[in-house]
Regions:
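N-terminal positioning helix adjacent to the helix-turn-helix/winged-helix DNA-binding module
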Residues: 3-7, 88, 114
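Nuclease-adjacent, charged terminal/linker segments that flank catalytic cores
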Residues: 1-79
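Acidic-basic catalytic patches of nuclease active cores, encompassing PD-(D/E)XK
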Residues: 64, 68-107, 210
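Active-site metal-binding core of divalent-cation-utilizing nuclease and nuclease-like domains
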Residues: 98-124
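Catalytic cores of nucleic-acid endonucleases
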Residues: 126, 131-189
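Short, well-structured alpha-helical interface segments that form or flank functional binding sites
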Residues: 87, 91, 113, 144
Length: 210
């Protein structure tokens, strides 16, 4: 899926539910023939589906389109403007759900107040995910994010009887899986395979237990 200004504008037309060509034109200000072409390209790349004269999108489809445009070399700073943090969290949760995890989104803990973006639980282990959704992060910024996520994980375990939990950071833009203090830093496009291998690699990943 090649990057272009029209494809960038088309991201704004990826709205959960059904959308007609006319709706898409009104939102994106792209002409009719280009709008149809863009929507068909989305569907061809597994983003949304077409039934009769309408195109149907899921909550996570906008982020899927963003990832495809980034892979084709599109500029992160321009593309990320079209992305909402809920799109990012939605895809993370969808991937976990597709792999039979129980999901909690935006879990609020009190005393002290902390929020965990996405929790996935399976086979007695919880993955606690902090989503860093758009910009490139320096190593010092990521280190700080890791420390905060470890603290959230400790709080979660302290409030959950018998819990085993692993803190994880998921980023939009990163070349490969990395580790800081044994906490995985996972690019979203590798998150699915990371989850597949998670239990086999658990001995290499930081976990917190009661």
């Amino acid at each position: 899926m090649k990057f272009s200004q029209n494809m960038l504008s088309g991201l704004h037309g990826i709205i959960p539910g059904g959308i007609s060509i006319r709706d898409f034109i009104a939102i994106t200000k792209i002409n009719a023939s280009d709008s149809r072409e863009i929507l068909d390209v989305f569907v061809k790349n597994g983003i949304g589906s077409k039934h009769e004269d309408k195109y149907y999108f899921e909550e996570s489809d906008k982020l899927k389109a963003v990832i495809e445009l980034l892979k084709s070399g599109g500029p992160l700073d321009e593309i990320s403007v079209a992305l909402h943090w809920k799109d990012f969290e939605g895809l993370v949760a969808e991937i976990l759900h597709s792999k039979n995890f129980a999901i909690i989104k935006n879990l609020i803990m009190t005393k002290p107040r902390m929020e965990i973006d996405v929790v996935g639980i399976r086979l007695g282990v919880a993955i606690l995910i902090d989503c860093k959704h758009w910009r490139r992060y320096s190593s010092s910024t990521l280190s700080s994010a890791v420390k905060k996520q470890i603290e959230r994980t400790k709080q979660y375990v302290a409030k959950t009887n018998g819990a085993i939990a692993a803190p994880v950071i998921v980023t939009l833009y990163q070349d490969k899986i990395d580790f800081i203090d044994r906490v995985p830093i996972v690019p979203i496009f590798q998150f699915s395979s990371f989850v597949d291998d998670f239990y086999g690699n658990l001995d290499q990943i930081r976990t917190v237990t009661t």
